[in-house]
């Protein structure tokens, strides 16, 4: 997590060898109310602080919601995007996007969990998310 700060990030990077280190920004289950309560900041302010840290650090990439991708077009790091939902769901994910939308916004990798792991037909569910 980028919240661990620069020292933690650099320690992880120096111990990683050839392994890529990704910094998690804000969880896709958080919204404006959550970030205000947890950090005393607006969502955008907290996200900007974490991304600034990512830019200044040696992380190889970031993990962020698809909704924040549009603000990261100039970030030359790997972008891993959870919160992918091709259909409307009633779960804890608050900032979601379809797989096609996420790739169009600049995602390098997407993360799809429950829509696949809890599907009746896992193979069909996987096919649904392939772009």
What are these regions (language model features)?
Residues 16, 58, 103-106, 129:
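Generic helix-packing signal
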Residues 1-8, 92-125:
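Glycine-rich phosphate-binding active-site loops on the catalytic face of alpha/beta enzymes
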Residues 75-83, 123-131:
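Short, electropositive alpha-helical surface patch
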Residues 38-40, 96, 127-129:
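General N-terminal targeting signals
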Residues 1-69, 75-78, 85-89:
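Conserved anion-binding
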Residues 83-85, 117:
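Short, cationic motifs built from Arg/Lys/His that form the positively charged side of catalytic pockets
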Residues 33, 73, 91, 121-122, ...:
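Short Asp/Glu-rich motifs
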